Swiss-Prot record, chains A, B:
One of its GO terms (biological process) is L-arginine biosynthetic process. The record marks T136, G137 as: Involved in the stabilization of negative charge on the oxyanion by the formation of the oxyanion hole. It comes from Saccharomyces cerevisiae (strain ATCC 204508 / S288c) (Baker's yeast). CDD domains: OAT (cd02152). Substrate binds at T177, K204, T215, E301, N436, S441. GO terms for cellular component: mitochondrial matrix; mitochondrion. This is Arginine biosynthesis bifunctional protein ArgJ, mitochondrial. It comes from the Eukaryota. GO terms for molecular function: glutamate N-acetyltransferase activity; L-glutamate N-acetyltransferase activity. The gene is ARG7. NCBIfam families: ArgJ, PRK05388.1. It is found in: Mitochondrion matrix.
Length: 441, 441
């Protein structure tokens, strides 16, 4: 079953993640412009400051966000949360983001710095309480506000805003830290009425590599008009099934933030919770958020595999998710995946210690566990456990083939209900230990 | 801050764990005899079968146990649980243990095999429902009952039982799997009345390396007479503060069992919950169990460090424990320890995402975090966070010295109450990934 380290190395080198996952073109939502610069906060001179701006004036924009639940919340998280609450999710027209410094665990001074970033952008756009701020990078260090201030001046001055592909890609680059590729996704959707709209998203993160790299940021913007409460409901639903369903190392940072702006630049009736299109848009946003979140796992520190953990036929969604998370976070499952070992025992074990809300969710005699190939090769499914009974004579050749894939699926059929949850995880490699054992040095 | 890999290698080689942690002599509780053999279940011919026997007839023995809460419980766990319940914790006079095969996820046949092991030993001692069984090793494989049966005959036949140091050490060896040294602890205690008694314990485990190596087993025997309910209460209390407070990789196996026998061979009044000595014996058993549990962490797979996580001045014991566990299980904290990096950010982060029962347990403005040297060098304490404020000018030379130690302490003072909890953990190394990436192969 063991694959030689040479082969592992080779299969790793075969993936040019930038070529595979970074788009080369795209169209973007109406009424948004973006700006970016290298402020100097990042010592190597890379892009490290970005602004997303809503320029549509036809109707008020709406905003929603999901923030980290870590009890140590960074200054930009606390500050943006307050802005959003005061604005009641309306008239947020700018997001300013910097990388290189997370402005986290920086006390009162850090809170002031976050507010100054907001005030600088509010001044530029001539509006009050209309800007959200986000920061990512090293924690426990103060922002170099002179550089940030000069950078914001530059973006609103000589650097100019743009709405073309390169501008969006550069903003996606400006929020990166240990990411090996920028994460930009854009997609057009159609509603039954024929109305077309666009979702564009960016994310950063290459591990819940908290909080030194202070961590997961995600932005989604759309030109569809969505009422603010409906928008928050959609984003919360989508985040629960996307950004909250990924595991690199199971650590949640002080800065995690996912936010969404809807500017209503498309001339159609505003969608609220009672609209007939509400459910469809919610699902489209969810699927879109999943694509974005999956890119974070694909860039998981040191990872060689992208693994979908699919828990189905569960009594409750929440318990399906708890089981998917338990498998996805298990160090033993992750090392087995790295070692390309069809170790069903570790998967069962992680299911067995998951802390379920309802014990009836799991019946040890009904469970089915399989590896699923994602490359159209046959047989697609390799059964490891059938109705609670381990398959002692597994086709080891086929197991090797599936486990050698860069993408694969672990399928768990609980057989206790009709609910399902997915998680996306990566393997735990020597490289992960090297990256995280040496980072701060 | 980074220590060269050569230095890491060297500091690792300096620890001869066998010489440091395996006793060379010891005295044992009255009325117990032990037997052992190499049954052939382990292919390499190592010891793999052991029996602990109570021979004291002066009064009935008592027994207690704490079993894994994993929903996939191995056959010996389910079978022993039933024996203990039927016996109501009384008249258990033998424990039979094998290594090399965990008899886990083996269905009805596995249940029968576990019962046969019990029946064989019951027959030998001429008693009914008096034997507990435990197994550890590979899961999903059936026990080779012919070898087990021959082995039990040998132990009760030509191999003979003994109560000397070598017999005890050999039983400790017979329960090992990936352990690099046998874990045997024996100690004499004195009660205020002048009565002396002995605790002897054995454990196996080198990681919660579940369930392939199927995992943590611990046995404690004493010659003190302890009423069965009081014994269960003591063992549960002790396990909560010892075997349940260790982390190698956070995975809990299908076979985890800690059990305790008290044979009352010492001529003194039986201790029950109302006895004046109850609290003292409980604390002595707890401290003893901690010594035994710590040996499991010291043998943690691939580990180079033994780290005590000390959470004090907490509002509740349970929340102190949840925080200690969160720090101890964090992959980022573990890799930072391996990299000898004074990364307080990762420790704060793990504290911040711990799922507390009472949010008032954590006040982000009151928290103190330090590294503590354990080698009597000064200054003993290196403050990383004081009253919620990170110490930005840490003495990096001193940090390097403390982090280069094989033993160190992470101290977290929550400042919200007067409760405390401890966890013992180890670092996450390249070696761990190698061991667990390649195991089943």
């Amino acid at each position: 079953m063991r694959i030689s380290s040479t082969l592992l190395q080779r299969s790793k080198q075969l993936i040019d993640k930038y070529a595979l996952y970074v788009p080369k073109t795209g169209s973007f939502p109406k009424g948004f412009e973006v700006g970016y610069t290298a402020s100097g906060v990042k010592k190597n001179g890379s892009l490290d400051l970005g602004v997303i701006l809503n320029t549509n004036k036809s109707r008020p924009s709406t905003a929603a966000a999901v923030f980290t639940t870590n009890k140590f919340k960074a200054a930009p998280v606390l500050t943006s949360k307050k802005v959003l609450e005061t604005a009641r999710g309306k008239n947020i027209n700018a997001i300013v983001v910097n990388s290189g410094c997370a402005n986290s665990v920086t006390g009162d001074l850090g809170m002031k710095d976050a507010q100054v970033m907001i005030d600088l952008v509010n001044d530029k756009i001539g509006q009050k309480n209309s800007t959200l701020v986000m920061s990512t990078g090293v924690i426990g260090q103060r922002l170099q506000m002179d550089k940030i201030s000069t950078g914001i001046n530059k973006i609103f001055g000589e650097e100019k805003f743009g709405s073309d592909f390169n501008s969006w890609l550069n903003v996606a680059k400006s929020i990166c830290t240990t990411d090996t590729f920028p994460k930009l996704v854009t997609s057009r959707f159609k509603l039954p009425s024929g109305t077309e709209y666009t979702l564009t998203g960016m994310a950063k993160g290459a591990g819940m590599i908290c909080p030194n790299m202070a961590t997961l940021l995600g932005f989604i913007v759309t030109d569809l008009p969505i009422e603010s409460k409906a928008l928050q409901k959609m984003l919360t639903f989508a985040t629960t099934r996307s950004f909250n369903c990924i595991s690199v190392d199971g650590d949640m940072s002080t800065n995690d933030t996912i936010c969404m702006l809807a500017n209503g630049a498309i001339d159609t009736k505003e969608i609220n919770e009672d609209s007939k299109d509400f459910e469809q848009v919610k699902l489209q946003v969810t699927e879109f958020a999943q694509r974005l979140a999956q890119l974070v796992v694909r860039d998981g520190e040191g990872s060689t595999k992208f693994v979908t953990v699919n828990v189905k036929n569960a009594l409750h969604f929440e318990d399906a998710k708890i089981i998917a998370e338990s498998i996805s976070n298990s160090m033993l499952v992750k090392t087995a995946l790295y070692g390309q070992d069809a170790n069903w025992g570790r998967i069962l074990c992680a299911i067995g210690y998951a802390k379920l809300n309802d014990l009836k969710s799991l019946d040890v005699n009904k469970i089915n566990v399989s590896f699923i190939a994602t490359d159209n090769s046959e047989p697609r499914e390799l059964k490891l456990v059938a109705n609670g009974v381990p398959q002692l004579e597994i086709d080891e050749t086929r197991a090797s083939e599936i486990l050698a894939l860069n993408d694969l699926e672990v399928s768990v059929d609980l057989g206790t209900g009709d609910q399902a949850a997915q998680f996306w995880t990566c393997d735990l490699s020597h490289e992960y230990v090297t990256i995280n054992g040496d980072y701060r040095s």
